[in-house]
């Protein structure tokens, strides 16, 4: 049997922008993406700690060492600049593999979104 498990998590990052006119996605500082083992185009779940919203979108890389976290397109309506998010990517694996799997967990600086 295969199950869905947390593969990657970027915990408590601050929204730096919301671009309603962009075609969609979330832009994430590429340093954060690499630290969390999230790749361009990967589907992620966004959890907004400020308003309880949850949504799914895909990732595009932002400039390194900027702390950028920008929601684009329709998702921009679900956040405000300064909101705190949790970004989660899931994987599918066999139950036995999942028992020993260790996700990539990233806890950036809560003020700058940069890696500590």
Curated annotation (Swiss-Prot):
Q: How is the cofactor bound?
A: Binds 1 pyruvoyl group covalently per subunit.
* Involved pathway(s): Cofactor biosynthesis; (R)-pantothenate biosynthesis; beta-alanine from L-aspartate: step 1/1
Native organism: Christiangramia forsetii (strain DSM 17595 / CGMCC 1.15422 / KT0803) (Gramella forsetii)
* A Gene Ontology molecular function term of the record: aspartate 1-decarboxylase activity
- Cytoplasm keyword on record: yes
* EC number of the protein: 4.1.1.11
SUPFAM superfamilies (alphabetical): ADC-like
Protein role: Catalyzes the pyruvoyl-dependent decarboxylation of aspartate to produce beta-alanine.
Residues reported in the UniProt entry to bind substrate: 57, 73-75
Q: Gene that codes for this?
A: panD
Residues at the active site: 25, 58
Enumerate the Gene Ontology biological process terms: alanine biosynthetic process; pantothenate biosynthetic process
Top-level lineage group: Bacteria
The UniProt entry's GO CC annotations, sorted and at most eight, read: cytosol
- Name the family: Belongs to the PanD family.
Q: Provide the cofactor list for this protein.
A: pyruvate
Q: Which reaction does it catalyse?
A: L-aspartate + H(+) = beta-alanine + CO2
Q: How does it assemble?
A: Heterooctamer of four alpha and four beta subunits.
Q: Which UniProt keywords apply?
A: Autocatalytic cleavage, Cytoplasm, Decarboxylase, Lyase, Pantothenate biosynthesis, Pyruvate, Schiff base, Zymogen
> Where are residues bearing Pyruvic acid (Ser) located in the sequence?
25
PTM info: Is synthesized initially as an inactive proenzyme, which is activated by self-cleavage at a specific serine bond to produce a beta-subunit with a hydroxyl group at its C-terminus and an alpha-subunit with a pyruvoyl group at its N-terminus.
What is the name listed in the Swiss-Prot or TrEMBL entry for this protein? Answer: Aspartate 1-decarboxylase
| Subcellular localization(s) per the UniProt record | Cytoplasm
């Amino acid at each position: 049997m295969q199950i869905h498990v947390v593969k990657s998590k970027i915990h408590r990052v601050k929204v730096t922008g919301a671009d309603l006119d962009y075609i969609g996605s979330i832009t994430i500082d590429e340093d954060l993406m690499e630290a969390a083992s999230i790749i361009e185009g990967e589907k992620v779940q966004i959890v907004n700690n400020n308003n309880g919203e949850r949504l799914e979108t895909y990732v595009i890389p932002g400039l390194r060492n900027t702390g950028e976290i920008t929601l684009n397109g329709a998702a921009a309506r679900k956040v405000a600049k300064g909101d705190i998010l949790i970004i989660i990517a899931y994987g599918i694996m066999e139950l036995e593999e999942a028992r020993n799997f260790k996700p990539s967990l990233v806890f950036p600086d809560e003020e700058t979104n940069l890696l500590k």
